[in-house]
């Protein structure tokens, strides 16, 4: 009798271990994190600055002496300061600004997944809610001082 009980106990323990294995099937719908469209997600502009400066390859833009970014969730603006060297063509500056805005938009989309990333045709949706003020200087001379409000188009095209 004791042998039967021990055998039955071992069998039940074995069955309970076998039934507790993980499932390796495909879920019918992926689990997605969602947030309400009106929920405020604060943007970390210091992180955007770090990401953008890291991604802007100095070899691609050797004419840029310095680049700094900051921003404010209160004003919904990104502030960009860039200093360039002498004799930079307008075309080169346009390419730089285009790439810079794409990098800013993509960095913002990483922080708030409701923003779409930039494509070849657009800068994504980050600049629909966030504006940008950029100042390009050459020494003491201001080359460009432009404010683009949220939703407005940029004054340069590639």
Feature locations, PLM:
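Sterically constrained small-residue positions within well-ordered secondary structures
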Residues: 11, 60, 71, 123-127
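Bacterial N-terminal signal peptides that target proteins for export
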Residues: 1-7
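Polar/charged, Gly/Pro-rich intrinsically disordered segments
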Residues: 113-158
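Envelope-exposed proteins and targeting segments
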Residues: 65, 76-78, 128-132
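C-terminal motif of bacterial Sec signal peptides marking the signal peptidase cleavage site
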Residues: 16-19
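N-proximal, solvent-exposed amphipathic alpha-helical segments enriched in charged/polar residues
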Residues: 24-70
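Mature extracytoplasmic domains of secretory-pathway proteins
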Residues: 71-123
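Sec-dependent N-terminal signal peptides
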Residues: 7-13
